[in-house]
Amino acid sequence: MVVVLAGCSAPSGTGSPAKAEETVVLGLGSEPDTLDPVLGYAADGGSLLYDGLVRRTPALDLQPALAEALPDVEGTEVTFKLRQGVTFHDGRPLTGADVAYTYTQVLKAANNSPIRGDYAAIDRVDAPDARTVVFRLKYPYAPILQRATLGIVPAGSGLTSGSAAPVGTGPYAFVSWTKGDKITLRANDRYWGGAPAVKKVVLAYTADDNARATRMAAGEFTAAELPPKAVARFRNQQGTTVHEAPTADYRGVMFPLGRPVTGDLAIRRALSLAVDRAAMVTAILAGAGTPAYGPVAPGTPWHNPAVAGPGTPDRDAAVRLLEEAGWKAGADGVRAKDGTPARFTLMYPAGDSLRKELALAVASDAKRVGIDIRLAGLDWDAIEPRMGEDALMMGYGTPFDPDYLNYELFHSSFAGQGFLNPGRYRDPEVDRALETGRETSDPAARKRAYDEFQQRISDDAVWLYLVYLKHTYVVRGDWSGLTVGVEPHEHATGGLFGTVANWKPAP
């Protein structure tokens, strides 16, 4: 990401701030579908509108937010005491009933919440009094506090997938949402954590990376997220600073496993041998990243180092593997097996220059071993219905507990549910490992389970993991309060942008 803060002109329609330090315009690439936590908005705590019972520090430690202290998590009952004096943006006091309502709405099957599976360990949430909330679990669940970052909404709130005014307890309150353009927020001067110095925040959305960089250079944004190569022109620009954040955010190719070519293990393994990950880091990420071989980031305690691949491609080994599996080279250089050419389509979101460049690199490397990859840059509405048929350059990743994302991406019960397990992967051993990791509280047993999970999906080459990114931010002006920490894939108003309530012009 890139964050730029200053007294520059506002984008069209945002209005000109009276004082630069009172208004910040953040240039973002991805607009949310909803601002409702029940429907998955910023469930991991990356929101300016909402608070959870707990929140994460930049170092990923958990600390109390709406809860007054971190509770004991032994057993199947976890009790939170709420912080006193907290009010919603509309003035209503926060009570235990609001917390119970929020989680109950997520768990209610009729609401079809996309994050419902994340809270499968919770049987119910009760509020015995105004300041007490009790999570009653189906089994001891080690990362339950990690799930307590969910933003809390007032009891009785309806699902707001459109632009209806959301209400939370966070440092900023909702003002307006112009779909396809911007969301405007105002400071919550009654915020329990202290009134923000920045009084107005505009989240300005531009999906195309190059267009967003151009708007940043033109001074339309006081902050913007950009891919690593796009920040190069800002590095030596007077008055701007580039910030790099370490992440668990990976890019890789999701294979539809029910198709003749991508469903062939030899094809998938050969591609993993053929691609030059180090070259991608150098040429595409401008050095702002590392090679990736799996969904659990190196350097995290849950990473299995046994799944790390070679530092350089081995295309001779890839060719041998394909030959032994019956994929023979044709006159046109494209391999075929039983009359089926080694050819498939790789989709990527059209406005994402980073994914486009990675897709081009994969296709180029694949061609060298006789695999023909056709590229298709599409919008997300066109991509989603094709995920069972065509490969996709995807991005995911979280530095939090390994139960996050991995269960939904690889457990067979989620096969084919939109962007959850889109490749329709089914493996009983992986299911058992993920279930053990989720339902066991013993750290050593969980580590063994997640090591087994990582090894199994590596052996199956379920995805072609390519790179872990650094999020790059550009900041114009001299500001205090900007804090960089380890970031997940979903970082919009989390990460560096999530600290905007602490930003102050440096004296």
Show which residues each predicted segment covers:
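Surface-exposed binding/hinge segments that line
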Residues: I115-S157, S176
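Gly/Pro-rich hinge or "lid" segments in bacterial periplasmic/extracellular proteins
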Residues: Q146-P196, K200, N210, R315, ...
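Detector for C-terminal structural segments
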Residues: T178, V275-N304, L354-A363, E384-P507
